Amino acid sequence: MPRHSRILATGLALLSLIFIRNASAQGRGGPPATLTAGVRGGRDFENHAWSLGGQVGLRLRDRFEIRPSGDYFFGDETPFRWQLNADGAVTFGPSRSIYAGGGAAFVKVRPLDDVKTGYNLFFGLSFAPAQSRSRPFAEFRWTWVNDTSPFRLVVGFSYRLR
């Protein structure tokens, strides 16, 4: 099994165990689903590129959120032009200020003028209580695609719509 596949399988297994444990502790009740939207900007340190994008979050359970997002990359050295993500995230701790997740990545690769698929792993910190309407965050993100895995630091905020 290739190294990247082992990392992905291990990460997904850990997230599944955490989600199952949290879901069983919550019982059948729980808060209603919440919807968030936000903007974010980041820096790809390997390819020396800046990014600007947005994300939407749909919290299905108390600590699990589906989080699609998209980013556009600026710079001539980066092979990436844009990236769409289909991610899920799990929050930790009593204040839900730490989160981790992963998912699929769809990346427009410039030299090939083609869209490649890969996967993401990330973890981050939210700087406001879970019940806050606006939540600033910082995220550490890796995307494996086209035999590369650049590290990105992403900062932004999410605003609760409902």
Protein language model regions, located:
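Cleavable N-terminal export/targeting peptides
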Residues: 1-30
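Short glycine/proline- and aromatic-enriched beta-strand/turn motifs that initiate or cap beta-hairpins
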Residues: 23-74, 160-162
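Short glycine/serine/threonine-biased micro-segments
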Residues: 36, 40, 99-101, 122, ...
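A generic beta-sheet turn/junction motif
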Residues: 45-47, 94, 127-131, 146, ...
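Gram-negative (and chloroplast) outer-membrane scaffold detector with strong preference
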Residues: 55-139
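Flexible, glycine/proline-enriched loop segments at strand-loop-helix junctions
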Residues: 141-143
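Outer-membrane beta-barrel "beta-signal"
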Residues: 149-162
